[in-house]
């Protein structure tokens, strides 16, 4: 049975594969679309196995928020050329839409969820591997929830943030917070949420610097505590200077909207080196 251009177009729409890959799969399967899809999928699996040790350092990072739930999804690949491909971005968007709709608990659950055609996200990623010949992986799935939420995607689709709040917040103020997180990369909302190993590391560094500077040993702990407080001001969100107005901390800026307004959590993911 001859393969028609209509058959090729139909399989291409189903699989996202290239025209020649679709033509070859249809010829090999004698125009059986189910078998042709399996041929394309197996090609993707073979490519994935060959390229499993490659680094997927490029990709597309997107985020969204709705009704107090916000999520980030990152689909990674090897080259910027593929990352900017419309079908790659569309797949990332479809994965994000599914995450927003189903709210899975982790990456594994997200990969197992179906897209509109009934095939899993994992299968769709494998199919794209076969099309592009590049390693691809779901690099991140992060989410946060609260009484209200916000998302931000930095131009270029390499960095995204989400944040959640304890009460309703004006949109521009929420967006300012999401952009602050993107720009200043805080490690936590509050000092008490900073990991203990980071605290210990900062104290040790401060003590060593003071000792090298010839400070008396009986003052080292006090100097180290002062350095730690400076670290908190620079690296915990509520204590950071607001990038749009350095006279205000983020906490003070939030209180211009409501005296009880605060950030309950945030997530940030980037493909760039900070």
From Swiss-Prot:
Keywords: Cytoplasm, Elongation factor, Protein biosynthesis. Its main location: cytoplasm. It comes from Porphyromonas gingivalis (strain ATCC BAA-308 / W83). It is found in: Cytoplasm. Associates with the EF-Tu.GDP complex and induces the exchange of GDP to GTP. It remains bound to the aminoacyl-tRNA.EF-Tu.GTP complex up to the GTP hydrolysis stage on the ribosome. Belongs to the EF-Ts family. Residues 79-82 are annotated as: Involved in Mg(2+) ion dislocation from EF-Tu. It comes from the Bacteria. This is Elongation factor Ts. PANTHER family: ELONGATION FACTOR TS, ELONGATION FACTOR TS, MITOCHONDRIAL.
């Amino acid at each position: 049975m001859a393969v028609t251009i209509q058959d090729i177009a139909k399989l291409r729409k189903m699989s996202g594969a290239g025209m020649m890959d679709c033509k070859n799969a249809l010829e090999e399967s004698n125009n059986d679309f189910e078998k042709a899809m399996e041929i394309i999928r197996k090609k993707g699996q073979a490519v994935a196995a060959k390229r499993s040790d490659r680094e997927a350092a490029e990709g597309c990072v997107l985020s969204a928020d709705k009704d107090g739930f916000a999520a980030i999804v990152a689909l990674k690949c090897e080259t910027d050329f593929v990352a900017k491909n419309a079908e790659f971005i569309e797949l990332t968007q479809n994965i994000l839409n599914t995450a927003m709709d189903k709210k899975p608990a982790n990456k594994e659950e997200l990969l197992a969820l179906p897209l509109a055609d009934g095939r899993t996200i994992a299968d769709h990623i494998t199919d794209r591997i076969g099309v592009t010949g590049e390693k691809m992986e779901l690099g991140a799935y992060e989410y946060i929830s609260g009484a209200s939420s916000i998302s931000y995607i930095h131009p270029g689709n390499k960095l995204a943030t989400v944040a959640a709040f304890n009460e309703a917040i004006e949109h521009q103020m929420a967006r300012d917070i999401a952009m602050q997180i993107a720009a200043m990369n805080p490690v936590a909302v509050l000092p008490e949420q900073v990991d203990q190993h980071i605290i210990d590391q900062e104290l040790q560094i401060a003590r060593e610097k003071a000792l090298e500077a010839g400070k008396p040993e009986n003052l080292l702990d006090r100097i180290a505590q002062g350095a730690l407080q400076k670290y908190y001001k620079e690296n915990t969100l509520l204590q950071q200077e607001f990038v749009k107005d350095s006279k205000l901390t983020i906490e003070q800026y939030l209180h211009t909207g409501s005296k009880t307004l605060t950030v309950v959590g945030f997530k940030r993911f980037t493909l760039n080196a900070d």
